[in-house]
């Protein structure tokens, strides 16, 4: 019977059998059978989930909190390359922390996001934001465990934060003098008066709207250099143009500048400029509406092969403002702007139509042009022209704002602070403090100052929340939660100085609540007028830290489930090495 089966039947039987993927296919893909399994998730609910998040937040915050205040300690961080890093910068410490437990690490990562966001907006106050976020989340967890509705609690905290911000804005003080600017910078630089004077001098020379950058110096002394230049908020078109991989930026000395009002996509458009760059052996920077297609590919290919140093940047602004900015760059660098309106074709460019500058630095976000070859008379005429348009009564407020920005970039120049030190570790630590101080100073100039040392938040807790009248026990809990949380920065500063934080904070809120400027100088151990003593915080820094911290921490309190990737299961042990399994063949081979 079996022999009578036709070839067709045999084929159908074979085809109906389940097919198996050959093991070699997995091996060729570098995957084991164990790795083909689906990864599962781990979940924690309710109190257990919030407790794990809180533990991670506590661990990270404990590391960051040690840096707060004039007597805060440094943190030593291992580096994957080079020397270990010593720093008091809160966001740097926060980013260095990774926890083994995935649920705890989830909380730590959210706290890292708070610090990073505060750093992006205000440039300082990251440690304060971390302290506040930890305190607010801790209070929220307690209230939720006591039976409060998490969503109502979040809304109540947000309303109380708004009341605190209004109180702080009503009591801020604008800064106008060089001495006040130096005070802000000194406090943010951990009491380093030298750094405070350095930043105030830089701001005095380039103006409050000028550009100040911080670089590593080559000597043991700090230096201040002021050079004429321009900065605009557009970075490199492609990361393939990067020349400094560690700092993720492009740096050229004496580059040629090509300015085009239109989008560049054809290779023929940029060939004359590329040839001029090759002939003169100078880097080339193309600034245009956009560069894409074959033109971009050719530039990247030449850069990767090492045949040509080249980079491309988009023109900042929109519409007529973009044309004006391009004209400003042209005057600054003595470059011809290629535009169809004047029948200036890029493919007909010659070397004398290209601009030149002493140096150019391009990051992902912005570009700084230093020592352009444009004549001072042409730049002065351009500035007068802009001032005339600003003075015109028909110019709108929006246009005036954009014109003021252009004027500052043309006339303000660029100040470069070169941080010196005896070693790379020392320079890195000091540079962190200088950058923080510079950001704090800019924030203070922008929005004003408040008494420092956590004093402003203490007085806001005592007086600013008095206008918020609770109508129920739940609302009272919300207000009490925020009052307890926003006193934490002042308490931490005092405790880092080796004193009893609860006693001093209690005295400030009870005996000195009516005096907004009265606070505690942790460096000297005295109750003083904080503004008169030069102990100040920028309003922008305090406000941003509070808003960012309360937003994330109160939202965390509404979390009911936490989900993470489960740890990978270890596969079975492989066979021992060598040819041990063939030992039984020995007797039959003679």
From Swiss-Prot:
Q: What does the record give under GO molecular function?
A: ATP binding; ATP-dependent protein folding chaperone; host cell surface binding; integrin binding
Q: Its principal location?
A: mitochondrion
Q: What is its subcellular localisation?
A: Mitochondrion
Report the transit peptide positions.
1-43
Please provide one cellular component term from the Gene Ontology annotations of this protein: mitochondrion
**Sorted alphabetically, which Pfam families does this protein's record hold?**
Cpn60_TCP1
Q: Which UniProt keywords apply?
A: ATP-binding, Chaperone, Mitochondrion, Nucleotide-binding, Stress response, Transit peptide
The keyword NADP belongs to this UniProt entry's keyword annotation: no
Biological-process GO terms, alphabetical: adhesion of symbiont to host cell; positive regulation of cellular response to heat; protein refolding; response to heat
Q: Which Gene3D superfamilies match?
A: GroEL, GroEL-like equatorial domain, TCP-1-like chaperonin intermediate domain
InterPro entries cross-referenced by the UniProt entry: Chaperonin_Cpn60_CS, Cpn60/GroEL, Cpn60/GroEL/TCP-1, GroEL-like_apical_dom_sf, GROEL-like_equatorial_sf, TCP-1-like_intermed_sf
Q: Which family does it belong to?
A: Belongs to the chaperonin (HSP60) family.
Q: Which PANTHER family match?
A: 60 KDA HEAT SHOCK PROTEIN, MITOCHONDRIAL
Q: Which HAMAP family match?
A: CH60
Report the function annotation for this chain.
Answer: May participate in assembly and/or disassembly of proteins imported into the mitochondrion. HSP60 are ATPases and have affinity for unfolded proteins.
State the protein's name: Heat shock protein 60, mitochondrial
